[in-house]
């Protein structure tokens, strides 16, 4: 069982448990026997590009966030390894800011929640938020490809999140999967099986899993050198508590035959 997690949020993002401190998260991971974690809260933006106000920390909170995690890293160094990081989105023109964030931290995970459409307006991967055209799905793949080529992320979070806005895994969705898998394999960047929706199913908050998407991971399983890992996407205590059961739900949803063909990496992001 994977005992590291590189997808952890904090109350600063505005949509996590406001009653949990950074240290509370650390204690929960220690309680579950984890040996290494990275805090990767939604990154601050120098310009206002948010699709809702409770999406990410303020830029003025960045230094306090990093200092808090560094303090916990030292305090708990004999019990668990802790890294600093951010979850980021790639947008054209943001490369300098993203590479600056990478230089300040241990891990950057790319969780692409939106793209610019042909009218230069943000289109968000949120269920029934707005219609998505083929060009929007392909733009999503293009952004991830460019970000990887520019050496921005260490990990791609929920690469199949684009399935939130469609019930069909058609030719375009298949093309998106291949672009992401091709690029990630070429550059050695792991793809994350996200556990947030499996936890939501366990808690009775939803009855259908949109991602992880079985068809996406079937394609991923065909790549001989593509790295994979699980990500809790922790915003709440229960997501850590239900970790093992969430993996079981995700594996059952994807299919154990597919899971067995995937190449899971260790805490150093290497396949043994």
Each model region followed by its residue ranges:
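An N-terminally biased module of ancient metal coordination in phosphate/nucleic-acid-related enzymes
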Residues: 1-92, 100-102, 165-181, 188, ...
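Conserved active-site loop/cleft motifs that coordinate metal ions or position small ligands
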Residues: 39, 192-194, 227-233, 260-261
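Short acidic/histidine-rich active-site segments
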Residues: 42, 159, 226-241
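Short acidic/His/Gly/Ser-rich catalytic and metal-binding motifs that mark active-site loops
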Residues: 46-49, 117-121
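Short low-complexity, flexible loop/linker segments enriched in glycine and/or proline
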Residues: 51-55, 206-214, 243-247
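A short helix-to-beta-strand connector/capping loop
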Residues: 78-81, 104, 152, 224-226, ...
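Domain-core and long-helix interface of multi-subunit machines
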Residues: 104, 109-115, 121-223, 234
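Mid-to-C-terminal alpha-helical segments outside catalytic/metal-binding sites
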Residues: 226-227, 241-272
């Amino acid at each position: 069982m994977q005992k590291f997690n590189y997808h952890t949020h904090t109350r600063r993002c505005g949509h996590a448990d406001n009653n949990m401190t950074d240290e509370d998260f650390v204690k929960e991971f220690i309680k579950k026997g984890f040996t290494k974690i990275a805090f990767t809260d939604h990154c601050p933006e120098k310009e206002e590009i948010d699709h809702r106000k409770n999406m990410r920390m303020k830029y003025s909170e960045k230094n306090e966030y990093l200092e808090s995690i560094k303090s916990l890293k030292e305090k708990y160094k004999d019990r668990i390894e802790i890294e600093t990081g951010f979850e980021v989105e790639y947008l054209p023109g943001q490369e300098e800011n993203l590479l600056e964030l990478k230089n300040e931290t241990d891990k950057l995970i790319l969780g692409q929640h939106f793209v610019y459409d042909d009218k230069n307006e943000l289109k968000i991967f949120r269920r029934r938020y707005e219609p998505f055209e083929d060009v929007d799905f392909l733009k999503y793949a293009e952004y991830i490809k460019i970000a990887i080529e520019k050496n921005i992320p260490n990990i791609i979070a929920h690469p199949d999140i684009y399935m939130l806005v469609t019930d069909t895994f058609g030719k375009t969705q298949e093309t998106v999967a291949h672009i992401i898998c091709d690029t990630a394999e070429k550059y050695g960047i792991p793809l994350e099986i996200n556990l947030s929706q499996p936890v939501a199913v366990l808690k009775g908050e939803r009855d259908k899993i949109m991602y992880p998407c079985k068809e996406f991971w079937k394609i991923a399983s065909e790549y001989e050198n593509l790295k994979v890992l699980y990500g809790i996407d922790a915003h709440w205590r229960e997501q850590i508590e239900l970790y093992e059961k969430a993996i079981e739900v995700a594996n059952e949803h994807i299919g154990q035959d597919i899971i067995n063909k995937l190449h899971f990496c260790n805490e150093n992001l290497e396949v043994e």
